[in-house]
Amino acid sequence: MKPHANHQLLIMLVLAIITLVAVACNSGNQRPQSASSSSFPATPATTASPSSSMGDMSTGHFMRNSPNAAIAPYDLQFIDTMSEHHRSAIQMAKIAEAKAQHAELKALARNIVDSQQRELEQMKTWRDKWYPGKPEAINMDLPGMMESVMDMGKLNSATGAQFDLTFIAMMTSHHSGAVAMAKDAEARAEHPEIKQLARQIVNAQQKEIEQMNKWKAAWVGN
């Protein structure tokens, strides 16, 4: 073989070796697509909390749906939903006991706390007796419930005479929601005890609504 031919062959061998080394290095550095993707944690999906849909827990009591509440027995739905409704009314009334300017509004607030606390205890007794161990069944789709969600931050921030009018506006709306659900229970409840409580709620809270509206008419502009 001629020296020139040997020189060309040597160059070709060197180039071939360099190419093989480069390919090997490149394939060693590459990772499968799935491995690269799995090395980074997935960004968690943003989910709305119950408080974001029904109120802010930092500013007061909030109401929310329980999972599968609509398939629970109606009387259990009423007990759990009205109990939650009562708890929010009690919280509002306790704020009024401390901040209301009119003595008669403070007295009403105390009566709301006392009467609804008694009803809460009665409903808990029934729940323990009739539905022991059953999961919570708060159903915000029952009549009057969505209208009963209150902005506790607004009530907390109100002062002076404006507080009294704000409380009246919120509590009359809240009571109206309770009356709507109680009337529904009068027609649909299975237990006579629930029907009787429902009538009691309708009668008591309608009277309180009427009284608050009279006060509002007398106090506006004074």
Question: Locations of the language-model features?
Answer:
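Bacterial N-terminal signal peptides that target proteins for export
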Residues: 2-12
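Hydrophobic helical h-region of N-terminal Sec-dependent signal peptides
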Residues: 14-19
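C-terminal motif of bacterial Sec signal peptides marking the signal peptidase cleavage site
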Residues: 20-24
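Bacterial signal peptide processing site
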Residues: 26-28
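All-alpha RGS (Regulator of G-protein Signaling) helical domain and cognate RGS-like helical scaffolds
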Residues: 30-222
